[in-house]
From Swiss-Prot:
Its main location: cytoplasm. It comes from Stutzerimonas stutzeri (strain A1501). InterPro entries: Urease_beta-like, Urease_betasu_sf, Urease_subunit. It is found in: Cytoplasm. One of its GO terms (molecular function) is urease activity. The keyword Hydrolase applies. Belongs to the urease beta subunit family. This is Urease subunit beta. The lineage of its organism: Bacteria, Pseudomonadati, Pseudomonadota, Gammaproteobacteria, Pseudomonadales.
Length: 101
């Protein structure tokens, strides 16, 4: 191995394999852009985002780690959410859960 060398396997990497997903239509009803990161509990996003909030409980955006989705004012788009994994306990964010899902 050479320092800094990449050793990449053939094929594709499937993110979040085997986890339940949900597609929702989300609209930004506010007057400012809203950006949501890859691991933010979608249920607790900015109230200016309108969508089926109850359905999003325990889910996050199904996008690569470290990335985000930006919603411009008045913009509406479909997003895919994926279930949170691990112990399924949520703390922080907007403080709407603060415990087990």
């Amino acid at each position: 191995m050479i320092p800094g060398e990449y050793q990449i396997q053939d094929g594709d990497i499937e993110l979040n394999a085997g986890r339940r997903t949900l597609t929702l239509c989300v609209a930004n009803s506010g007057d400012r852009p809203i950006q949501v990161g890859s691991h933010y509990h979608f249920f607790e996003t900015n109230d200016a985002l309108t969508f089926d909030r109850a359905a999003s409980r325990g889910m996050r955006l199904n996008i690569p780690a470290g990335t985000a989705v930006r919603f411009e004012p008045g913009q509406s788009r479909e997003v895919e959410l994926v279930e949170l994994a691990g112990e399924r306990r949520v703390f922080g964010f907007a403080g709407r859960v603060m415990g087990a899902l």
